[in-house]
Amino acid sequence: MKNFVIDQNLKELTEHRTVELPVACYKTTINQNINGYIPLHWHDEIQFVLILKGIALFQINEEKIEVHEGDGLFINSGYLHMAEEKEGSDCTYICLNVSPHFVLSQELYSSYVQPYMFSTNLPYLFLAGNQQWAKNILDAVKKINQLIQQKTSLYEIDITMQLTLMWKNLVVNGFQLEYDQSEMIKSHRMKQMLNWIHLHYVEKITLEDIAKAGQLSRSECCRYFKRMLNKTPLRYVMDYRIQKSLLLLQHPESNVTEVSYQVGFNSTSYFISKFQQAMNMTPLSYKKMNS
């Protein structure tokens, strides 16, 4: 069982190889995550995904994308996203996270990378394995994964060559970039509200509190959450508290009552009820299975 680590801002704490090689590449089986899915998060790195087995359902901002075996995604820097497997397909994929500054030389970054980082109409690109330009990118993802595993002589240089090839294919087959200030503001406000929840989830939280964090009215706040997460703000708070309880329940010395209060519930019975709804088992059953 793996724990997907994010900070209170929902920023993924990606582990890079070294400062000299700011690349993380690994295989992920979605249902082996502690939550059973990859929770909502974002990161500064750009991300390439290649589905090796099964079907993944990604949500990037408010859009949902189904990705099948042999296909993949490019996910841009800074965008909120999450993933779950579809229909018990035991989905496994390669995930490649790369610092944008490492894709091309610094001299080329401002012309060929930075415009893509700041565009507002490129949260992601679907990479269809039956299109040659996309296949070139996906093959390079596999090659980089092999290079990192094998660490043959000068493998770091080989990785930079593959990244250059990937980015050229993406740029040549991309589209007209757009820059919409209102979309930037929406994304920033959503992150502000989520960050506030993650800092205060152990406290009593009202809809007004969340809306205030995003400088929105209560109705606007609800529309943001409905559009981006397809749930109400307070339902998100509930789900986040359950998510935080999973790690605590795995500690051998923890007990259900203590955990319920540590994640913001003021009633153990209510915590048990909501946990069972979310996880299809009681907190105690989960603890026995995972501690």
From Swiss-Prot:
SUPFAM superfamilies: Homeodomain-like, Regulatory protein AraC. PROSITE patterns: HTH_ARAC_FAMILY_1, HTH_ARAC_FAMILY_2. Residues 208-229, 256-279 bind DNA. GO terms for molecular function: DNA-binding transcription factor activity; sequence-specific DNA binding. The keyword DNA repair does not apply. Keywords: DNA-binding, Transcription, Transcription regulation. Residues 191-289 form the HTH araC/xylS-type domain. PANTHER family: ARAC-FAMILY TRANSCRIPTIONAL REGULATOR (PTHR43280), HTH-TYPE TRANSCRIPTIONAL ACTIVATOR RHAS (PTHR43280:SF28). This is Uncharacterized HTH-type transcriptional regulator YdeC.
